[in-house]
Amino acid sequence: MPLRMSTLFLRTLRDDPAEAEVASHRLLVRAGYIRRAAPGIYSWLPLGLKVLAKVERIVREEMDAIGAQEVHFPALLPREPYEATGRWDEYGDGLFRLQDRRGNDYLLAPTHEEMFTLLVKDLYSSYKDLPAYLYQIQTKYRDEARPRAGLLRGREFIMKDSYSFTVDDAGLDAAYEAHRAAYLRIFDRLGLEVVPVRATSGAMGGSRSEEFLHPTEVGEDTFVESDGGYRANVEAVTTVAPAPLDEAAMAALPAAEVKDTPVSTTIAALVDVANQLAPREGEPWTAADTLKCVVVTAVVDGGERRPFVVGVPGDREVDLKRLEASVGSALGVVGEPTLEAATAADLAEHPALVKGYIGPAAVDAVEGTPVLGADDSVSGLPFFVDPRIAPGTAWITGANADQRHVFGLVAGRDFTWDGVLEATAVREGDEAPDGSGPLHTRRGMEMGHIFQLGRKYAEALDLKVLDVHGKQVVVTMGSYGIGITRAVAAIAERYHDDKGLAWPRAVAPADVHVVVATKGEDGLAAAETLAASLEAEGLTVLVDDRPKVSPGVKFKDAELIGVPTTVVIGRGLADGELELKDRATGEARPVPVDGAVAAVLAEVRDGR
């Protein structure tokens, strides 16, 4: 049976929703695919569910093709498995937590690693049972602080998550490559360009990790690529550090010297003063010769504020997002803390920090020479440095005293640090870590993420099997996710114009949109006959048979809804002609009534 717009639960809108930030959000609401229930939470209407089902079908077909089997877990999960893996705390405020009437703790699932692991533990005990690839398509919940952009950043969303269970690393590598290839096929069928890039693992843990990013200016992620093939999310880019000097070479460098540097609280002012006070022969001082020490505050679960200092070259900016990926473990806190610039109140608790003149070593105010003890750090706060601050590099940096700086302070000789972190923003033109050329930055939207989890969850939940020698071994796991609802939004973002959506045929809510643009029974009868013939050929049909709606409104709705092929039954019907229109190109041409089915089938087979 065709979908008839006279009875379809649908209301198109002429005005954009007030909260819409991106085209996909605006058009999916206006065209009647989704409706907002609350911030970050959406209801799916009949047309939206048809698109969603087609995306899910493609994902299922490709997962089944690699031997994965579908299961389905509850969304309401007990606390205990997540406590065993540490993620009850790691997720922090991102979890939706609740209690039953007896006071037992539960969560709404953000992911299901623990449940998959326990299921396999309950049922499998031998290497003969493995490998096993399991997947589900299910609703997830994350308490996003700032849900935005409609389906792109929500609190409730649908994901395909799959997990591989193998006896060893070789099996994990095979599972990873099988999923990687399946993902590329999925996105190709969805009509989405994706770029696989190196990524961090975040709260998921594990080793090898790749994101599949769809290049788009509305994407929240920045990634880089080189002409030589290096590709990575900026959070995963490793800095090319200078070669360190040995102790003898460092000892031979000139001693550090404290100088008065009036009115030099900015890097630019400091460089000007340095070139006046201590001009360097042959090459003037630049911002790259300075070491700026930035105070950052980590806000951990529960709101505790943990200030620390990070030293970076003066010509570089601190990237809080890159820092977040690694600073949690460096500070000894669980999970990824939220980072923000230190406030005046944070600085007030550490009076040794003189704003504008902070450096890695304290200053002896009487003698005027730097105190360069090997264990000194800034005011007792943890002190981390960017990889460019390598042993033997010399810097102009703050002396922790008003209008004073230290010249020639040598890293590793005159000061040490508590850790090396990727702290600075990646810039256009930076050298690729693998030497494959300069990096170019692009914006992208994360569509999928695959991880080699290794044995993290299996060890935490004691998932073991007997190997071929009868010895118990910890199972090796992989995790592979695709955002289903995000894929719908990404396709809408990619395939639209100023008139509305223009779905690729693989996911369109119908193959053909038949618009009855004449009055009387002849037009309706022709539409029913055409729809029946098209359905007999295996196509799905949406018929606009609304009796009290003008042709102009019907045409606008057809463009807004975005079915790939439109057949207009209009004035030409009296002469035995219909109009066939391609939504993507806007091209329209007349076709004879008795040749309409063949013409539509030709378009479908051509992939138009």
UniProtKB/Swiss-Prot annotation:
CDD domains: ProRS_anticodon_short (cd00861), ProRS_core_prok (cd00779). PROSITE patterns: AA_TRNA_LIGASE_II. GO terms for cellular component: cytosol. SUPFAM superfamilies: Class II aaRS ABD-related, Class II aaRS and biotin synthetases, YbaK/ProRS associated domain. Coiled coil: none annotated. Its EC number is 6.1.1.15. GO terms for molecular function: aminoacyl-tRNA deacylase activity; ATP binding; proline-tRNA ligase activity. It catalyses: tRNA(Pro) + L-proline + ATP = L-prolyl-tRNA(Pro) + AMP + diphosphate. GO terms for biological process: prolyl-tRNA aminoacylation. The keyword Cytoplasm applies. This is Proline--tRNA ligase. It comes from Micrococcus luteus (strain ATCC 4698 / DSM 20030 / JCM 1464 / CCM 169 / CCUG 5858 / IAM 1056 / NBRC 3333 / NCIMB 9278 / NCTC 2665 / VKM Ac-2230) (Micrococcus lysodeikticus).
